[in-house]
């Protein structure tokens, strides 16, 4: 059994797991694992899988789509990941950095007394030039 937590941000839901869990359980193929656990009929069901790794002693978020493909980033996912990090006392500060495939992201968080959690992430300027978009599937972009 793999320990995980499930979070939701603006209607997108994510399974979040620490990579240590996957290593301890002998799960080497994260793409296959993502497809299995994200399956809404036979798995837990989610839009994606977020895996916490550590790089240079900093939290690193790896994102997998529900079909098992890896993507460089997910906007709603990073906010849910920030909530997971705070809930699990991985960082103490309200402002912290998380590494993702495209680079480091600074996240500002706030926990309200009523329980609402807020995360603000500057993901940089949007890219509209299709020649500069990361295309991990190597498909032709129109």
Q: What do the PLM-derived regions correspond to, one by one?
A:
Residues 1-115:
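A glycine-rich beta-to-alpha transition motif near the start of alpha/beta enzyme domains, typified by
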